[in-house]
């Protein structure tokens, strides 16, 4: 199953992480936004655990933020104890139409988000997948 490029949406949200594979989330989200003439934003949720983050993870996060900004995303840093709860609340407040997120977070989000379209895309040379959430059906 591939991404739905025919869906019309006004805004796309990228979920940033410290993963070296997060660039794939950014690329796909930017492509979806471009195809739909949608605004692009990105969010990273900082938790208390992030204080003990390794230097390599911090570096990867900085690179992912810079990459998202280079694709035209407005980056927002949120603070909280639960990444998924913060993302879901941000989506509700911001009226985001589409969220592009890594599988590790998406599997947790599915328990909180109902009646959404989920599309997956394989990472190149990797078993992981991306998930695409279309929130336009909520309005």
Language model region names:
Residues 51-76, 86:
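Long, charge-dense
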Residues 37, 72, 95, 115-117:
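Residue-level detector of structured alpha->beta connecting loops
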Residues 1-20, 98, 113-139:
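Intrinsically disordered or low-complexity boundary/linker segments at protein termini
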Residues 1-5, 71-99, 105-106, 127, ...:
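Structural beta-alpha unit
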Residues 3-56, 69:
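Small/aliphatic-rich secondary-structure junction motif
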Residues 45-50, 81, 124-125:
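Short beta-alpha junction loops
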Residues 41-43, 74-79, 119-121:
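General small-molecule cofactor/ligand-binding pocket signal
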Residues 27-29, 87-90, 108-112:
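A short acidic, amphipathic alpha-helical/loop segment
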């Amino acid at each position: 199953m591939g991404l739905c490029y025919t869906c019309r949406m006004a805004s796309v949200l990228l979920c940033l992480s410290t993963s070296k594979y997060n660039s794939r989330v950014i690329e796909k989200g930017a492509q979806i936004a471009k195809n739909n003439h949608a605004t692009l934003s990105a969010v990273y949720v900082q938790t208390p655990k992030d204080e003990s983050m390794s230097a390599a993870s911090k570096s990867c996060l900085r690179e992912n933020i810079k990459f998202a900004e280079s694709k035209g995303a407005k980056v927002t840093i949120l603070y909280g104890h639960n990444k998924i709860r913060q993302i879901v609340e941000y989506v509700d407040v911001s009226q985001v139409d589409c969220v592009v997120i890594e599988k590790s977070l998406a599997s947790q989000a599915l328990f909180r988000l109902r009646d959404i379209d989920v599309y997956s895309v394989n990472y190149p040379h990797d078993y992981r997948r991306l998930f695409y959430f279309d929130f336009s059906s909520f309005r």
